[in-house]
Amino acid sequence: MIGIQEAAKAMIAAGTKGKIINTASIAGRTGYADWAPYCASKFAVVALTHAGARALAGKGITVNAFAPGVVATPLWEQLDKDLMAMGVSSAPGEAMENFSSSILLGRVAEPSDVVGTVRFLASPASDYMTGQVLMIDGGMILQ
């Protein structure tokens, strides 16, 4: 919320239109029992994206978000270790494999899969959209 407020404040003070791009997650669209606090924080990002879009559209500022699913990053490597420590999984890589088994495209995302969406949101091609959350999950939680 502070990021949206400060970015909007700077754009308004400069008299410019602009784009605010938030980072959500698939966890902001569906709840996961073992990750309730994380899910709550990402549901909040989605709600703040919607609220920010409504509040700032009249100032020429768009507010959108991207919501990655399982992305091959150090965060997921750590999460895999954490889930083993919690007893949710019993072998390295098992949690990530189980969690990503429902990805319709059959693989986890690479960071490069996310970059194109973020570039689109930052580009003039997205000028006529606001309040949207773009899922980058390979169809994992198809809605």
Language model regions located:
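A conserved structural motif in NAD(P)-dependent oxidoreductases
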Residues: 90-93, 103-114, 125
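A glycine/serine/threonine-rich, flexible loop-to-helix segment
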Residues: 71-102
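Alpha-helical segment proximal to the catalytic Tyr-Lys
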Residues: 9, 54-55, 127
